Amino acid sequence: TVTTWDAAINKIADKFQSCIDQYGRDSIAFYVSGQLLTEDYYVVNKFVKGYLGTANIDTNSRLCMSSAVAGHKRSFGEDIVPASYEDFEHADMVVLVGSNTAWCHPVLYQRIMQAKSHNPDMFVVVIDPRFTSTCEQADLHLPILPGQDVALFNGLFQYLYQNGHADQAFVDAYTEGLQEVLASSQQETDIAYVVKRSGISLDKLQQFFEKLAQTEKVITLFSMGVNQSSQGVNKANSIINCHLLTGKIGKLGAAPFSMTGQPNAMGGREVGGLANMLAAHMDLDNPLHQEVVQTFWGSPFIATQAGLKAVDLFRAVEAGKIKAIWIMATNPV
């Protein structure tokens, strides 16, 4: 049915207000998407948390990036990617983990290939159970068994430490928990155990470990094959730990690099477009952060309790607890 903007907006407003009056503010929900522009993400998040007064706004980006977010927070204290696209142009080794970059991130893949054309010695490794299009241009493909990334990178961590490749000055100055990581990955000290767990041949495993140990400028890009997993957070941390141990981070051409599954999953996190966040990576359950954001917004409300996350949100819809939902830029069906 054709309608006007005014009629559509008025109808939505009336329906939302009716639900709020009858069932409370948490009867309303928004399900948004990593395909929204950052500005749109910001406005809808402000509207829901500051003007509707609920935190029931979540995104399909949670399904692809929540494990990376948790890994970043556990490693760095905040959700931050310590690199930029320009770093790929300065790297001497690029490790692609759980990513068919050629198909899923073609623009970045072409950028990596262009960098390799200017620097033919750039060593590209693909870690993926399948032989994909990305593997065709790689120098080394590691066909890992599904779900064994933690064993692989814990094995790399132990190899780097046991063979004197730790940057002890960096570790002492900027990290904590080294002994705990060494203790928790003790099994992976045995490279035969890593071979068995990962399904990767000893020759390929040694080539990978030795090449990474000898290369200063290393970027490890990890994506959906890492994140969309029951062990996603641990996988992310096992990758990041190797960079922290060797100091291959915070330098031109060297960093762990989590790649989103959708074009603006990171933008959504920047503006707080999740049920448990406020804008600018502020914490929704922190009273000081609540005050800062509400004052900046000049809004009548500010959500103070985490809303329903993606899966729980749709369970609440099924249970009849959510009376109205606005779905933006995605098709969850």
Features from the language model and the residues they span:
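Expand to "…catalyze enediolate/carbanion chemistry for C-C bond making/breaking, isomerization
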Residues: 276
